[in-house]
Design a protein with these regions (language model features):
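Gram-negative outer-membrane beta-barrel domains
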Residues: 1-228
Length: 228
């Protein structure tokens, strides 16, 4: 009797979707046009929501070991806010609109079941807003493309010769960045002109992601191996 050996080698493309949470802590360092000493903690919040996107990669298998490279890009809707601990009439808002992961993988396969770990670079598209707590009026804003690192792990199941599904967890280490916020003039253009720097904040960020994935592997020229 011949038992098929599942082959994880080859190029693959797929889709993913799930949930994310970005933990951000804000410290004001400049307000307005004056250095804040000591740095004043504005507080933290979790920006949560859904993610959906795709991935493309290549894997090669040696005995039970599986190695790979992958690029992933997702749209995101991770939103959160907190009332500032610096001035209570301010609310700090954040949103991640997209992210990308560029990783290497190492895993071990038990026939059509693959467990893997991954690590590499991460990038996020971040938007920040300051609003009046009572009215929601926008008084300043900032944005950035932030680079950091990612580690993750996943469990994948091959349910057909070229198809597999997986569940994956990733943690993004996005570090601490300083951002200057542009004034809208809502709190008084005489204090800070429209378009001027209203304040500067140091913002720390980490992101956690849980996604379900489906992949199609092309496996060009790779026949199914059998064993007796």
């Amino acid at each position: 009797m011949v038992a098929a050996i599942y082959d994880w080698s080859g190029f693959y493309i797929g889709a993913n979707g799930g949930w994310g949470s970005s933990h951000k802590c804000w410290d004001v360092t400049n307000f307005p046009r004056a250095t804040v000493v000591p740095i004043f903690r504005e507080g933290c919040h979790d920006a949560t929501g859904g993610v959906v996107g795709g991935q493309i990669g290549y894997r090669w298998q040696s005995a039970g070991w599986v190695f790979g490279l992958e690029a992933q890009g997702d749209w995101a809707d991770l939103n959160g806010s907190n009332v500032s601990g610096f001035i209570r009439n301010w609310t700090n808002n954040s949103k991640i609109e997209a992210f990308g992961l560029f990783t290497g993988q190492v895993g071990y396969a038990w026939n059509n079941v693959l467990w893997y770990v991954k690590g590499g670079a991460a990038v996020t598209d971040d938007k920040y807003r300051g609003t009046v707590t009572a009215t929601g009026a926008l008084f300043d804003s900032a944005s950035e493309t932030r680079w950091g690192g990612v580690v993750g792990t996943g469990l994948e199941f091959g349910f057909a010769p070229n198809w597999s599904v997986a569940v994956e967890y990733d943690h993004l280490f996005m570090g601490n960045h300083s951002r200057s916020f542009t004034s809208t003039g809502v709190l008084g253009a005489a204090v800070v002109p429209v378009g001027g720097v209203f304040r500067t904040d140091s913002i720390r960020q980490d992101v956690d992601l849980i996604t379900a994935r489906i992949n199609y592997r092309f496996n060009w020229g790779g026949p199914v191996v059998g064993k007796y």
